[in-house]
Amino acid sequence: MNISSSIDPNDEKKYSLSLEDNKEFVPIKNFWSTALINATFFDINDKDKKILEKLTDICYIPLEYPSFKIEFRFEPNEYMKETTLIKTYHFVEKEKDELRKVEGCEINWVDDEKNPTIKLKTRKKTRGRVRETVTTSKEIDSFFNIFNTKDTDINKELVEAQFFRNDFLENMLEYYLNIMEIHYDDNDEEEEQDDEEKA
């Protein structure tokens, strides 16, 4: 079985990068969740990990170059109503380093307890003779925040887009096996040497 991770952005077809459609391919349990966690690029909390175990495929779908979208496919689960989540990166025409806008998607969580993007806090409150339970929520770091693009930082989104296209999807197997090498450029080495000399 040959797993090819080379992506030609000018090719208009859809890439099912986990080879899910290959009849000879035997799915690897927790392949994508393990690869995403090992990449250490995203803030992934404990609830995220459980939900990502339901992730069966990640598809890279080229749009008008150099724009593209990423499709995350999940098996039916007890956390959210959707089985497909989509993130779209719209670039300035022919400018692969200039992101114009991004589009996420709405996620309908089964209930607040299943929502990994918030932390619930319950406390007892007394009003006269009545004692009631009050539940409040606080937004927290989560992988699934990438689909909320309401108040997004376009520079951070560009880094994310480049990570998916130029790094993660080309090296998914290495990330899964946790053998991905970290490459430093010459500037990084010079800065490291300067720090050592100062020490």
Locate the predicted segments by residue.
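Mixed-charge, low-complexity intrinsically disordered segments
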Residues: 1-199
